[in-house]
Amino acid sequence: MSEVEKKLEMFVTVYYSLNVTLALSINILLLFIMKTTKSSLLKDMQYYLFNTALFEIIVSLSTYFAQCRPVANKSTLAVFCHGPCKYFGKNTCFVTFAVVQCSVVAASFSILLSFYYRYRLLKVNFKKKHKHATTFIIFSFFPTVMLLFQLLTDSNFAIVEAETREMHPDYDYVNNALIGFSDSKSPAAIIAQSLISLGVYMSPLIAFHYRRKINKILSTNTGQRIPVAYCKQLINGLLIQTLIPFCVYIPPYSYFLYSQLSGHSNLYFEYLLNIFGSFTAFINPLLTFYFVLPYRRALCKKVFKYFPSISEEGTEITTFPTTVQFQRGHTASTKF
């Protein structure tokens, strides 16, 4: 094991511990605020925000449990797992790695689902619970298929280890569990990788598409069932939540695809891939608190009231009847 890898292992151990602590704390707080805050501004939007928070919890737990980094070889894909999963066997690490990949994409898709719901709510009446259930089932199909193809990909760990030791003899094989895919060019592996790539690269484009459609509806209709300013702020928050993974995850993921084709790998990028994938687990709930006004006010009223330095002005929970028609020029401004 090189000195650089030793330092990186120490860093990621500390990072994943902090990440899972922050992510669980903030997401559980968000779920508590969701449960105790009632506002007609949100309607059934809380189901979709709850869905995102749930996937972020899965992302934080699975990335901490695995602490994995993929290493591209010529014909195989190796995965070094430094997390607690290594104490439960290689098969446990293999399943956890598949869950990590799929949960990151599923969390991103859950934000797109919120975009879709907001668009449908403005376009047509979309409030029946069975319609929500149908939508969740349809959108869960993509991550589920991705997970199945990952689990069905050839995974002869002995073949993976033999090629990895040949190409990367200086890596740490003592303190990590080595798993991976023995044939990275097989149909199942290609399909799984294509689905992940599709989810990573297409999410921002889909988000921009629905943002444009929603803004078009808001600009062409002066009367809305919800305040225009609130809706625009919510949509901007969802867009930022979609773009953050795009900005931080695309560079290392693109290099990972390149390394699979070239057979060359960089130690730093290997670690960065899943570090950036887990980064949003505690960032997204913070953005939800900021951009979803009823939750921000509830947070200030129930939590920040214990901190004298934070003003309580404008923290009351305000709800709006759904039957009232709001004009753009009469949208109330809120102090924060």
UniProtKB/Swiss-Prot annotation:
Q: Pfam families, from UniProt?
A: 7TM_GPCR_Srd
Membrane topology per record: Multi-pass membrane protein
Annotated TM spans: 14-34, 48-68, 93-113, 133-153, 188-208, 237-257, 275-295
* GO terms for cellular component: membrane
**Which subcellular locations apply to this protein?**
Membrane
Query: Which PANTHER family does this UniProt record tie to the protein?
Result: SERPENTINE RECEPTOR CLASS DELTA-51, SERPENTINE RECEPTOR, CLASS D DELTA
Keywords of this entry: Membrane, Transmembrane, Transmembrane helix
Which protein family is it in?
Belongs to the nematode receptor-like protein srd family.
Q: Which InterPro entries match?
A: 7TM_GPCR_serpentine_rcpt_Srd, Nematode_rcpt-like_delta
This protein's name: Serpentine receptor class delta-51
